[in-house]
UniProtKB/Swiss-Prot annotation:
The gene is thiE. This is Thiamine-phosphate synthase. It catalyses: 2-[(2R,5Z)-2-carboxy-4-methylthiazol-5(2H)-ylidene]ethyl phosphate + 4-amino-2-methyl-5-(diphosphooxymethyl)pyrimidine + 2 H(+) = thiamine phosphate + CO2 + diphosphate; 2-(2-carboxy-4-methylthiazol-5-yl)ethyl phosphate + 4-amino-2-methyl-5-(diphosphooxymethyl)pyrimidine + 2 H(+) = thiamine phosphate + CO2 + diphosphate; 4-methyl-5-(2-phosphooxyethyl)-thiazole + 4-amino-2-methyl-5-(diphosphooxymethyl)pyrimidine + H(+) = thiamine phosphate + diphosphate. It comes from Mycolicibacterium vanbaalenii (strain DSM 7251 / JCM 13017 / BCRC 16820 / KCTC 9966 / NRRL B-24157 / PYR-1). It is an enzyme of class 2 (transferase). GO terms for cellular component: cytoplasm. InterPro entries: Aldolase_TIM, ThiamineP_synth_sf, ThiamineP_synth_TenI, TMP_synthase. Condenses 4-methyl-5-(beta-hydroxyethyl)thiazole monophosphate (THZ-P) and 2-methyl-4-amino-5-hydroxymethyl pyrimidine pyrophosphate (HMP-PP) to form thiamine monophosphate (TMP). CDD domains: TMP_TenI. Its cofactor is Mg(2+). 4-amino-2-methyl-5-(diphosphooxymethyl)pyrimidine binds at residues 41-45, 82, 120, 149. Binds 1 Mg(2+) ion per subunit. 2-[(2R,5Z)-2-carboxy-4-methylthiazol-5(2H)-ylidene]ethyl phosphate binds at residues 146-148, 177. Belongs to the thiamine-phosphate synthase family. Mg(2+) binds at residues 83, 102.
Amino acid sequence: MRESRKLDSAALYLCTDARRERGDLAEFADAALAGGVDIIQLRDKGSAGEQRFGPLEAREEIEVLATLADAARRHGALFAVNDRADIALAADADVLHLGQDDLPLTVARRIVGDRIVGRSTHDLDQVRAAVGEDVNYFCVGPCWPTPTKPGRPAPGLDLIRATAALGTDKPWFAIGGIDAERLPEVLDAGARRVVVVRAITAADDPGAAAQRLAGMLSAAG
């Protein structure tokens, strides 16, 4: 499957909100993807746009995802839906990302079929479970506390080191508070793929920020 090959080579994963308060999602996504983002995921929970306009309704979310889908396909990248298997199916998403408390994997698979499915993990037991279950990739963290997930303890780089020591062939991404300044520490801990949020979404030049991160990841191999 072409999408699986794209996942195998993916190193830079971006989570973004819908940027409703700025109204620049299409331009932002295009710049970030041109800069080297491999996977772009919509996650609007807790965003400035949600605080101002309220939660995205399903119809609105599908419209936002259409913008991301268009940009991702023009740049040969993958686009992901957070949590909602029904939205992933309706939007024809490449990827569904599940948290620990989201829909059970078996149910999600019945809805999205053989689409790429990922899983969040926050301790070594969850990492081991993700290695063994029918997910295509998993995320490990948070490496540092982050406002995206307020109140969630950060297991830190020790969990990244422990995950790297497992030597799994399944793709996995470090996540949580990662930016260009902290990325060398994450790479030293053994990760070769990362998820970022504010490192690109809050950048004055999202394309340049993505390009810098992608270059560092590429150099690390």
